[in-house]
């Protein structure tokens, strides 16, 4: 039995889960918020009871020390020697990393070198890695990359039709994200279908505040909707998804915004929030549609129809599909979104049951038993994938 901690470090936050392996039992989980800001918040669950503390947490090293201190204080572990491995989520692995890696100083340096590909995320992930290394220098640590699963995409999927030297010199290509989630749910779908993943064509819809669709053939990602950054693809909570690139100088000219300001608008003020004008939270949008809010209705239709189109194009790409998977916050919980996305897909053999679709947050088949294409809701579990990779690489 080993104890593995899975870490997801953001710029001012640190999410954690402690697993007992190989049983994959969650011993505790929690969140440190507002790191480096006033009134930091530390939350941990102890015997299914949430304990919260507010205190100043100046940096990630302090957050890590606090977390480890609480694990022993609450008797979750006897001492720090019980921690056998640490798994870190790293958003961008570039072309360099097509699998998770054991973290050496050299590997940390290589991750730092590709940080320009994900300036919002990778630096924070690295801060988390270094904070743990400082406090637990002898515990093996593994980096698990969001982009790694998509490194199996063929050239025709990942190349942009730009001058080829941009790819050679600057690494400009599609990378794709949510890879750990897409990998988990497609492997789980194969188990639920009782078929080897090698013979399956799956479309995975990871729908949260960020959303991406992946075409997974024989267990390998062959295409995905996000691109060089997580801004591409379908419309999201606050992100625009795909737009005509010529709009950027046009918007700059019309509004007087700089390129960075337009990019900020595309990342933080667009998507569901941009169209509805009042919220990026899908639950608010759905409630507003019930009250007859037309802009909310439009936002919901745009969101669902873009996903619907990706499903059609990926089915064509794989010459068919065996199952469609819904996961992440919206995919797992929004009956309405699934209904709108699936509507009209009968022509390709998707027959779903409105009664079975009335499910939230748990594994379920929502297609009729006779449906040639199965539709499955699978709650994602990126943390357990991280823990499994630590066991695979460090033990």
From Swiss-Prot:
Similarity annotation: Belongs to the acetokinase family.
Catalytic activity field: acetate + ATP = acetyl phosphate + ADP
Localization, UniProt: Cytoplasm
Site (Transition state stabilizer): 178, 239
GO cellular component, one term: cytoplasm
Annotated pathway: Metabolic intermediate biosynthesis; acetyl-CoA biosynthesis; acetyl-CoA from acetate: step 1/2
Protein's name according to its UniProt entry: Acetate kinase
InterPro entries: Ac/propionate_kinase, Aliphatic_acid_kin_short-chain, Aliphatic_acid_kinase_CS, ATPase_NBD
Binding locations of substrate: 89
UniProt organism field: Bacillus licheniformis (strain ATCC 14580 / DSM 13 / JCM 2505 / CCUG 7422 / NBRC 12200 / NCIMB 9375 / NCTC 10341 / NRRL NRS-1264 / Gibson 46)
Binding of ATP, residues: 15, 206-210, 281-283, 329-333
Gene Ontology annotations of biological process type: acetate metabolic process; acetyl-CoA biosynthetic process
Cofactor dependency: Mg(2+); Mn(2+)
CDD domains: ASKHA_NBD_AcK_PK
Superkingdom of the organism of origin: Bacteria
EC code(s) of this entry: 2.7.2.1
Keywords: ATP-binding, Cytoplasm, Kinase, Magnesium, Metal-binding, Nucleotide-binding, Transferase
